[in-house]
Amino acid sequence: MDKFWWHAAWGLCLVPLSLAQIDLNITCRFAGVFHVEKNGRYSISRTEAADLCKAFNSTLPTMAQMEKALSIGFETCRYGFIEGHVVIPRIHPNSICAANNTGVYILTSNTSQYDTYCFNASAPPEEDCTSVTDLPNAFDGPITITIVNRDGTRYVQKGEYRTNPEDIYPSNPTDDDVSSGSSSERSSTSGGYIFYTFSTVHPIPDEDSPWITDSTDRIPATTLMSTSATATETATKRQETWDWFSWLFLPSESKNHLHTTTQMAGTSSNTISAGWEPNEENEDERDRHLSFSGSGIDDDEDFISSTISTTPRAFDHTKQNQDWTQWNPSHSNPEVLLQTTTRMTDVDRNGTTAYEGNWNPEAHPPLIHHEHHEEEETPHSTSTIQATPSSTTEETATQKEQWFGNRWHEGYRQTPKEDSHSTTGTAAASAHTSHPMQGRTTPSPEDSSWTDFFNPISHPMGRGHQAGRRMDMDSSHSITLQPTANPNTGLVEDLDRTGPLSMTTQQSNSQSFSTSHEGLEEDKDHPTTSTLTSSNRNDVTGGRRDPNHSEGSTTLLEGYTSHYPHTKESRTFIPVTSAKTGSFGVTAVTVGDSNSNVNRSLSGDQDTFHPSGGSHTTHGSESDGHSHGSQEGGANTTSGPIRTPQIPEWLIILASLLALALILAVCIAVNSRRRCGQKKKLVINSGNGAVEDRKPSGLNGEASKSQEMVHLVNKESSETPDQFMTADETRNLQNVDMKIGV
């Protein structure tokens, strides 16, 4: 607390110093027309634009003067005020500048803050890049005004040029978008028209009671991750009043949360930090922020794509109980869907790409919400941003935040549902290509700004600043969730993974898969929520580990279990997280009995879910061998079943070797008996002993001749003695020769 008050005291002392400094980045003059940027991009109101041009002894240019400047080579990728319009001069078509259009592109929305163009009648008729050294018509004031020329030269003077008190002391300041040529509600499509950010009611057929809420909330920050061939870019947003003074005195926790790291799977990634810490491209943005505007013929070098979500967060807990009927007018119509149509333009210095899509203005969860509707579940439709492809890039930005009014365990009253379901479409007069820019929204719970649904036009930036939780999204995937034609048959899920999610989503392995179904009269089932502890974090910040990205950090993972009373079907959507890669999957299990169990194994954990009407929370850990759950509705506590031990492979191999040895021993024993019946001699004669040993002296010649000896000898040759026969056995066989005399 002492640290907080110390920072607060220093901040209060230094805020006047930081606010008393204005940097004006100007470009070369083309037929007297030049571009002026104040501090960050898009931080000049229409009244201030006129005062600023007057301070430069200039005026707001007319359309004819802009066209003349365009004819001699003046083009930018910045929306700026001229007389009666907000325009971008474009010579070369670029998919992310002016929606791939050329000429003086007119933006129909001109009620917010942009840059400005000025016309100096005394300037040369051609290109003039001489340095501007002062504001000739500025009057005395306490503001330090720094003029930054295109070549980087700086000239400082004290004074003031603003005459409107609202410009000097804005009562409703808005953030400037220093990362993009346009913001979501100012984006445009081909043909010179735009879709404003406004609330649209899309009731389900047979529903004729559209509803809308006047409650406002803050817009969460959005990060667009773009890939053209092999590069990855992350768009960021900053505030005008934040400079290095503010950065020095930010709490360390807030600094840690100001990082967004992205990586596209399968590509060589360039990592851009979403905070103010310098790295390859963010530092370049800071330099441009201080040195020059980035207008001119090489404007494409200054821009990285960024979008701002118009999806509000969840209601305040106390206000939600009062205003629930605004979100859900009747318990019998939970199918009413509220969508916000948003057009989005990402500007890089060569052009503008228009996006259009449907964003859900439903409550955006800061991982855990503290409000809930006790009886009804309100499904909301999938939010999409429709990308306008170009000759080199096709960009898709999606964001979806879903929440369901169900009881939250341990007293929390809302379960968030959030996913990034992406459907791509085409904007007018645009062509498809094969190099997509894939967008991913990074919700920041404390970085949001309010959007009034009754106001069709939102400010380009919200009032919040980016000091909330950090959710890093690496790689990308798109999920198409389609409701079935029959409201009682559930959902059709099409999961299309384009790469592994090395999700440093905080890398929170945190991504929920939400459902949108029709025909539910009153769904009393509560969502099933899992909290996963990931012990395997891989940062993708080019070898640097994010300071707030510690191993074992805990994130939230939601799964939703819904029941269909008419068909007695239970469909469970459960995110499955891999401990090694952080990849996600959704398992849809349909069972005939509403009380059946759905088993899920999470990286070694085996959790059993009992969709029996209560809120079942399962806490899993990748390092633990078991998991446990608790059911809010009763005293039952379920634990995962113990996995049956398996026979190890080494034991199987050992048993096989023993069997083989036994067979070999039997074979050897059998072969050792081969000598039986092979070493016998049969001798047939009339005397004793062998014929060779007898002397024929006792026989006369005729008798010896008449006697016939039969000497049968069955023996092996001496060259191949039996190796199994010993010497004793050989002698015994010789003495046991059978002699038969005839």
Curated annotation (Swiss-Prot):
The gene is CD44. The lectin-like LINK domain is responsible for hyaluronan binding. It comes from the Eukaryota. Detected in fibroblasts and urine (at protein level). Detected in placenta (at protein level). Isoform 10 (epithelial isoform) is expressed by cells of epithelium and highly expressed by carcinomas. Expression is repressed in neuroblastoma cells. It is a single-pass type I membrane protein. The keyword Phosphoprotein applies. Residues 1-20 form the signal peptide. The chain crosses the membrane at residues 650-670. Keywords: Blood group antigen, Cell adhesion, Cell membrane, Cell projection, Disulfide bond, Glycoprotein, Membrane, Phosphoprotein, Proteoglycan, Receptor, Secreted, Signal, Transmembrane, Transmembrane helix. Residues 261-273, 439-452, 476-489, 528-539, 592-606 have a biased composition (Polar residues). GO terms for cellular component: apical plasma membrane; basolateral plasma membrane; cell projection; cell surface; cytosol; extracellular exosome; focal adhesion; Golgi apparatus. Glycans are attached at N25, N57, N100, N110, N120, S180, N350, N548, N599, N636. Hyaluronan binds at R41, R78, Y79, Y105. This is CD44 antigen. Residues 179-189, 386-396, 422-435, 502-516 have a biased composition (Low complexity). Disulfide bonds join C28-C129, C53-C118, C77-C97. It comes from Homo sapiens.
